[in-house]
A protein has these predicted regions:
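Kelch-like beta-propeller repeat domains
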Residues: 1-296
Length: 296
């Protein structure tokens, strides 16, 4: 079971890996893998493949390479077809679906599926438009949603891997890039939440929640502060916002969305924090056996 939070890379460039126990504030966890700054810096993507954390792309070194984070170090696990930074990804059918991004000269609308067992990727479905600094939310085992990004006002799209087709969805209430997104269930229905982000120089504290079945957006709970370049994860149907950047600089805070039976939600700041404040990093949940934690 994926129960611990792994944070890798990001600004500042020398930020080490960190493992955080989201459920027990008294636990201190040993970090896994070595410092990623010598391999890539920020703007990476990643996911858990075969219970192993995999990180791909990023600026500006080895932007087409993928690494597996292990106890003994961060090991090269394969390559991508394209250089990619500021992409977005989701784990689909035990492969990492990597979408869009920037190759150093232009935006991409190509996608690829990285297969850990093969150590390489295969072409994925082409995006409706080139984009970076966007977000991808996994809806289920065969559907994922692409949201926001620069530099356009395009609506979100849902891709169905079984039907091999894109479906356009209703536009966000506020267009945004560098936002975070995650999924959760509410009364048995899948929801997508989008938080923070920026557009035209404005940084947002607002959140929006999509009812996937009805295709309607509603306002979500306001973040405690304006925030962008952060990450979001969902553990046991609880949504977390991690790190990011504000006008005051890089953030170490972790917020959890808490909702009443009346579906009134707010953000609760956790005692746990990132030891090195950072933004534009990759965060994912990893199995307990990968992270050794003990009481402080």
């Amino acid at each position: 079971m994926a129960a611990k939070l792994l944070v890798t890379g990001g600004f500042p460039n020398q930020a080490p890996n960190e493992v955080i126990d989201l459920k027990n504030e008294n636990n201190h966890c040993n970090n896994i893998g070595d410092d990623l700054s010598g391999k890539f810096k920020y703007g990476t993507v990643g996911g858990l493949l075969n219970d192993q954390p995999v990180i791909c792309g990023g600026a500006y070194i080895d932007t087409n390479q993928c690494y597996t984070v292990k106890d003994q170090g961060t090991l090269l696990s394969g390559t991508l077809h394209e250089n990619r930074m500021f992409s977005a990804s989701a784990v689909i059918n035990d492969s990492l679906w990597i979408t869009g991004g920037f190759d150093g000269s232009s935006l991409s609308k190509a996608t690829e599926m990285f297969h850990l067992a093969l150590g390489k990727s295969t072409p994925g479905p082409e995006l409706p438009y080139p984009v970076y600094h966007h977000c991808v939310a996994k809806i289920n085992d065969f559907q994922a949603m692409m949201i926001g990004g620069f530099y356009n006002l395009n609506p979100p799209y849902l891709y169905d891997f079984q039907q091999e087709a894109w479906t356009v969805l209703p536009s966000l209430m506020e267009p945004r890039g560098m936002a975070g997104c995650a999924t959760f269930e509410e009364q048995g229905q899948v929801k997508v939440i989008v938080s923070g982000g920026t557009m035209n120089g404005q940084v947002f504290s607002s959140t929006e929640i999509l009812d996937v079945q009805s295709g309607t957006w509603r306002q979500g709970p306001e973040l405690p502060q304006t925030l962008y370049k952060h990450s979001m994860v969902t553990q046991n149907n609880q949504v977390y916002v991690i790190g990011g950047e504000t006008k005051q600089g890089y953030q170490s805070t972790i917020y959890r969305m808490e909702c009443s039976e009346l579906l009134e939600c707010h953000w609760q700041e956790l005692t746990q924090k990132i030891q090195t404040p950072r933004c534009q990093f990759t965060a994912m949940l990893v199995p307990d056996e990968l992270a050794k934690c003990e009481q402080n």
